[in-house]
Amino acid sequence: MSVLISQSVINYVEEENIPALKALLEKCKDVDERNECGQTPLMIAAEQGNLEIVKELIKNGANCNLEDLDNWTALISASKEGHVHIVEELLKCGVNLEHRDMGGWTALMWACYKGRTDVVELLLSHGANPSVTGLYSVYPIIWAAGRGHADIVHLLLQNGAKVNCSDKYGTTPLVWAARKGHLECVKHLLAMGADVDQEGANSMTALIVAVKGGYTQSVKEILKRNPNVNLTDKDGNTALMIASKEGHTEIVQDLLDAGTYVNIPDRSGDTVLIGAVRGGHVEIVRALLQKYADIDIRGQDNKTALYWAVEKGNATMVRDILQCNPDTEICTKDGETPLIKATKMRNIEVVELLLDKGAKVSAVDKKGDTPLHIAIRGRSRKLAELLLRNPKDGRLLYRPNKAGETPYNIDCSHQKSILTQIFGARHLSPTETDGDMLGYDLYSSALADILSEPTMQPPICVGLYAQWGSGKSFLLKKLEDEMKTFAGQQIEPLFQFSWLIVFLTLLLCGGLGLLFAFTVHPNLGIAVSLSFLALLYIFFIVIYFGGRREGESWNWAWVLSTRLARHIGYLELLLKLMFVNPPELPEQTTKALPVRFLFTDYNRLSSVGGETSLAEMIATLSDACEREFGFLATRLFRVFKTEDTQGKKKWKKTCCLPSFVIFLFIIGCIISGITLLAIFRVDPKHLTVNAVLISIASVVGLAFVLNCRTWWQVLDSLLNSQRKRLHNAASKLHKLKSEGFMKVLKCEVELMARMAKTIDSFTQNQTRLVVIIDGLDACEQDKVLQMLDTVRVLFSKGPFIAIFASDPHIIIKAINQNLNSVLRDSNINGHDYMRNIVHLPVFLNSRGLSNARKFLVTSATNGDVPCSDTTGIQEDADRRVSQNSLGEMTKLGSKTALNRRDTYRRRQMQRTITRQMSFDLTKLLVTEDWFSDISPQTMRRLLNIVSVTGRLLRANQISFNWDRLASWINLTEQWPYRTSWLILYLEETEGIPDQMTLKTIYERISKNIPTTKDVEPLLEIDGDIRNFEVFLSSRTPVLVARDVKVFLPCTVNLDPKLREIIADVRAAREQISIGGLAYPPLPLHEGPPRAPSGYSQPPSVCSSTSFNGPFAGGVVSPQPHSSYYSGMTGPQHPFYNRPFFAPYLYTPRYYPGGSQHLISRPSVKTSLPRDQNNGLEVIKEDAAEGLSSPTDSSRGSGPAPGPVVLLNSLNVDAVCEKLKQIEGLDQSMLPQYCTTIKKANINGRVLAQCNIDELKKEMNMNFGDWHLFRSTVLEMRNAESHVVPEDPRFLSESSSGPAPHGEPARRASHNELPHTELSSQTPYTLNFSFEELNTLGLDEGAPRHSNLSWQSQTRRTPSLSSLNSQDSSIEISKLTDKVQAEYRDAYREYIAQMSQLEGGPGSTTISGRSSPHSTYYMGQSSSGGSIHSNLEQEKGKDSEPKPDDGRKSFLMKRGDVIDYSSSGVSTNDASPLDPITEEDEKSDQSGSKLLPGKKSSERSSLFQTDLKLKGSGLRYQKLPSDEDESGTEESDNTPLLKDDKDRKAEGKVERVPKSPEHSAEPIRTFIKAKEYLSDALLDKKDSSDSGVRSSESSPNHSLHNEVADDSQLEKANLIELEDDSHSGKRGIPHSLSGLQDPIIARMSICSEDKKSPSECSLIASSPEENWPACQKAYNLNRTPSTVTLNNNSAPANRANQNFDEMEGIRETSQVILRPSSSPNPTTIQNENLKSMTHKRSQRSSYTRLSKDPPELHAAASSESTGFGEERESIL
């Protein structure tokens, strides 16, 4: 019952059900009942904080001091929970204040712990003890302080609590308060006098724990009490150390201000500074450094603060520390200095800081490594550069570390050198250039692969062909290294057990035992020999197994194993040489033996004493044999060589017994004798023994006596080496004579070959003796043939590989000169001779090879006709062959390059393919019709070439078909000349389909190819032409254009110079044809006029080979003799002594026409077949080229069109209207185009000045519309640039000025020829302007060849530098004065012969005079348009020619007037080119009057100035090219005007008044000009041909040069060829009036004594040494030099003519050509350089025609001003 009642009371208390509790308490008086935890209802109510229930229970007599099971009372429960009123009630009841619970805690303790401030205050007021302690002796104040109850701390302190009381560990309330940063508690405690230095747990003081927690304010409070700031914790850390490590900057500063010691180390030895550095706290480090912290104290592992800063990579900290001058050389325990550590971390900034502070680069770590070792091993160029910036430290490159490595060697062991990047190339050697510099990597790899092919049967002769001075010798060493690598000579043999080992060990041990037995005792001898035998075999076993184990610990065993094997193998070889006949080597097809090479070191055949140098070469080869085979083997072979009579038995025999049996018998006798002597001694008693000894001695003695001769031979052979014998023979050359000496050489060479073969058969190797012959092209030419014969005789048998490195042209020339008459009469020439000697020709064409990767071909058919079925096993095998480049294999480093397994597998695959290829090729070649003239030697040569070419193609990852490659190689090998024609055509002609067969191409160009050797001596190097045609027609495989693309870059047997020669001769032929001379033209072919193609290649402007008009196309006229082209007489082809023509002669040109013309022009990308002129035809322009609408009358006479609408005057609507008028535009797109124009506000001014490319992007037209629109814009720009309407004189004489560009109708209206004749002619134009040149390279990027990207060589270099780049100056420096003199003489002869041929019976000299400049200057200048077209082609984008892209109008100020005197020389007679005489030349001095305001020094710089005034584009950088060499070379067809009135004044220069102070200066200047040009005329070709760069195109211009250039440009007047109607307007010039023979007049160009006036128009075309300081390195994006390179000047006095006559001359300028094959004259309208002349005319103004000096001054000034403004507006 009571339990129920009590439960009810407790329940009611817990439920706080007061009414029920009251009711229950009234019934039941027991209020102190407990629950299961021993709690009474009062405890529960006190804990719950229910005051009313507590009061009720107390009123009913509840006991306040009862305890529960944990000794808790109601007071403790109420205090813990903070119920103040209940505590107060309980206190009133007299509760026990000091009662402790189970943990010894009183109510006060709990209240302090829980932070019950009111309860604490109440308990203290009732007398509670504040110093009571609980568990671990913790006081209430400690709990309050540690838990941050500041008010309680204050109350306790006021009530007498101990301020410095401590717990069990000595930790005071202050430490506890500071540990958590309870600032108020700290303040109360400090105020009551708490001890700040008392240490608590872990020796921590209040300051330390406050610092560790980072409580700045607490630290500040504690520091106010002046604590001991240097106290440390148990780890030795002071407060400052802790603050520094933790990064509390403010605390550190406070501590430092309080006077803390900064250098106290902790237990590990680290100082405060090191701690701060390790923590990366920059500000703290600075603060410590300001307090003079010791920076050199070594901490843990001997690391200083500086080292730690470096290790942390903190450059700021390093900089701060370095400012305090630390010791930078203090090492850590690993020996590392800060610099070494920084280098290891690759921290460039820190390294630089340390070096600036003087850290030593020579410091070493424990491995002996310097920072340089580390930097170079880490491949850090910048670090190495920093470390080596002091030149004195360069010596450290050669300081080895403990492993013996030097930085230099470490660098050398890597493929890409760092030191070379720092210092530049250390030395120019094949290994250093790595082949890439010269592009020879693939050549050397492919050749090495061929020559190391085990199945390749020597002897073979390889020809490395390149021009003299091209650096081909660099390839030789690289080839040697590659061959050694391919041959795998670095593999070392390991020790093996063999019977020879057993025999030798038994012999050695037996001999040793005999020795001891003989000297000491027989038993000792036996014991020693057996013991030694056992030791030897134990040693052999260890070596055998140890040498095959991996790991550095067994490296010594490997070394011993290889050395032992080498020596035993050598001993075995010696024994085999003496006793064994060499076995036959197995067939290489069944077992491929490893190959090894021996090289000659002395490979230079000197011109003096060729025999001696050959002897030296063979001697070096014998030395190489001795090094490879050993000293004894090579010398003993001379004695023990196998005679052919020995037969094929295994053993050598003596007296029918194998020699080794006799040898063993003798050895046995000797051993037996010694044994008997050892046992029995010499004792007369032993008669039997003595008899045996005597017989043994007899046998041995007899053997020695019989072999005396052999012993003598052995002795002689050992003492006299092969080198010594050769030198002895050479010293007796005067006695032996040449034949005897050759016999000695031949014997020695044969002995060497036999020795190599014998040793190979024993060692199962293939030895190939490589004879490298360099320098033949430097020999005296009369000795070359002798040297070749000698080499062929000596090395034509045996394992020899002869490598010729020479210039084939020099060699062939020398051979031709020295061949005997029998060979020459039998049609054998130098080419045949060299072809017979050389089995594998390799023409080094590095530029073509370097571009080969552009032509990667992925198609499997490789250009086959789609229907042809050429797939099969071979092609599958082709695809399976690894595509690894040979060059890349060697670049991967030594490990990869020497990985024999990979190399072997790769090469075995290639050899399988090669064998299959050879088999298939042989079958292919035999079945073809053209096989009839292929000899076995030719077959071998073809297979060699195919093999090399195939490797190069594979190396460049070009997929190909072997059959096609073989056909191509046969084509290039048998008919190189005709193949070069095909290639030249493909290079110069774009748009040729890939599938077009070479047969088709050949049919197009065949009639342009000379047919007789008299015309072209190079025909002699070709085979039968009938076989050539049969070959091209052969059914399988049919070669197509694509095959040429694929194979040409890697073709090594075709001389690239052939194409240069063909182009040179062709250019000369065409230029002669242009002059209208009596040169019989090449055959022509009838055909419809071709539309001009942007990629076609007419090499001349008006070639006689290209007139489709009235020529009888089918007539084949005779071709001139070859001397017509060359400077040589006789059949010898002049490889060098031929004219040089600028490279841009050979590239396509494009002729912009009017917009209407473009309507009828087919697409530029058309692939119509070209007619059969090989691209020599001139592009025919429609007559409707003007800006007006085309009419039929445009070809005949008709009214001149109205005034041209200026582009600048058009507004936006007018531009839209103009757009709609363009015929051919897509009408559906016109609204969109007009919208774009209006949106972008494109008016006339915008069109006149904008960049064409930007306009294209903005207009966003389709291709055809854009082409038409662009052409219209460019034509309008061009037309506007020709009109200066504000000049009244221009307006008044507009009808007599030259017709603007593209207006044939206007010209035709004044034509004096009959209309019928004119209309039948085809007007030809060469539209070429300087602004077209000037803007080249400005708006476009790199030249694009969008269609035929494989034509890497469309621009050929000069004759002398076909191997290297055009800028190669190395070769030029090698040209001696003698060579240049030979060039000069050759060109004189060449020009003379050309002139004589021109003056032949068929020449057309209508007025009885011919032109002296026609031969040479036409040769130089007819290519004027070629410059434009060539550069224009480079600008081609998306296969579209852009004639005037981005071109700006070059109009001068409108105040300028046109000077017709500068536009040319009037040719009034019927002669195509008038001779310009001395008088004409004098009149050129009027050009000097253009400089009246200049200083005399500036005027005299006539030849030093560069062409600046051609347009602003000239200021841009230009591409370096030999195109500069020929100057601007404008064509000769710009109209030149002349007046009858001025004819009286011809030659009278001084008639035009000028300022007195300048009266004589221009004359002196021009006389000086003549002197300069006298040599320039003949030296021009020389410098060009030898690669000397023209220096007229300097980018370094000055403004004062521009005006001087104007003077040149005024004299630079161009020639217009006139028709018969003007023949009577000009008389014979005075200076030539006495010369009746036109040849004499023509020859004046070649005379050095009499300077032709045409020479003086060659303004600065080719500088020589005697020119004024103008020798600069130049570059080409501008036109070179002056306008006139070849257009002989029109004198100013001649230009003073009445304009009535000028009108007649201006009407139509025509050339009449009368070739022998043409029944009708051809009139050619040539508008070349119209735009240029008009621009120049605007600059030169009418005032120059006046005789008033002020006007002259005005002309010059207005010109200068105009140019300056123009430049500003454009730039």
Curated annotation (Swiss-Prot):
Region spans: Mediates interaction with CRKL: 1089-1092
Task of the protein: Promotes a prolonged MAP-kinase signaling by neurotrophins through activation of a Rap1-dependent mechanism. Provides a docking site for the CRKL-C3G complex, resulting in Rap1-dependent sustained ERK activation. May play an important role in regulating postsynaptic signal transduction through the syntrophin-mediated localization of receptor tyrosine kinases such as EPHA4. In cooperation with SNTA1 can enhance EPHA4-induced JAK/STAT activation. Plays a role in nerve growth factor (NGF)-induced recruitment of RAPGEF2 to late endosomes and neurite outgrowth.
Name by which UniProt lists this protein: Kinase D-interacting substrate of 220 kDa
Tissues showing expression: Abundant in developing and adult neural tissues as well as neuroendocrine cells and dendritic cells. Overexpressed in melanoma and melanoma cell lines.
Gene Ontology molecular functions: PDZ domain binding; protein kinase regulator activity
Ranges of Basic and acidic residues composition bias in the record: 1431-1457, 1537-1561
Organism: Homo sapiens
A GO cellular component entry from the record: cytosol
A Pfam family recorded for this sequence: Ank_4
Entry keyword ATP-binding: no
ANK-type repeats, residues: 4-33, 37-66, 70-99, 103-132, 136-165, 169-198, 202-231, 235-264, 268-297, 301-330, 334-363, 367-396
Phosphothreonine PTM sites in chain numbering: T914, T1679, T1684
Phosphoserine, modified sites: 882, 885, 918, 1163, 1296, 1352, 1359, 1361-1362, 1365, 1521, 1526, 1555, 1574, 1623, 1633, 1681
Region ranges (Disordered): 1182-1202, 1285-1310, 1344-1368, 1397-1564, 1578-1633, 1713-1771
Extent of motif PDZ-binding: 1766-1771
PTM remark: Tyrosine phosphorylated by NTRK1, NTRK2, EPHB2 and EPHA4. Phosphorylation at Ser-918 is induced by phorbol ester treatment. Phosphorylation by NTRK2 is induced by brain-derived neurotrophic factor (BDNF) and neurotrophin-4/5. Phosphorylation by NTRK1 is induced by nerve growth factor (NGF).
Ranges in the topological domain labelled Cytoplasmic: 1-499, 546-659, 707-1771
Composition bias type Polar residues, residue spans: 1346-1358, 1403-1430, 1460-1470, 1713-1731
Keywords, alphabetical: ANK repeat, Disease variant, Endosome, Hereditary spastic paraplegia, Intellectual disability, Membrane, Neurodegeneration, Neurogenesis, Obesity, Phosphoprotein, Repeat, Transmembrane, Transmembrane helix
Classification lineage: Eukaryota, Metazoa, Chordata, Craniata, Vertebrata
Biased composition (Low complexity): 1359-1368, 1585-1594
Presence of keyword rRNA-binding: no
Listed InterPro entries: Ankyrin_rpt (IPR002110), Ankyrin_rpt-contain_sf (IPR036770), KAP_P-loop (IPR011646), Neurotrophin_sig_adaptor (IPR052771), SAM/pointed_sf (IPR013761)
Assembly description: Found in a complex, at least composed of KIDINS220, MAGI2, NTRK1 and RAPGEF2; the complex is mainly formed at late endosomes in a nerve growth factor (NGF)-dependent manner. Interacts with RAPGEF2; the interaction is strengthened after NGF stimulation. Isoform 2 interacts (via C-terminal domain) with MAGI2 isoform 1 (via PDZ domain). Interacts with NTRK1, NTRK2, NTRK3, ERKL and NGFR. Can form a ternary complex with NGFR and NTRK1 and this complex is affected by the expression levels of KIDINS220/ARMS. An increase in KIDINS220/ARMS expression leads to a decreased association of NGFR and NTRK1.
Membrane topology, record value: Multi-pass membrane protein
Main location (coarse class): membrane
Domain notes: The transmembrane domain mediates interaction with NTRK1.
One GO biological process term: in utero embryonic development
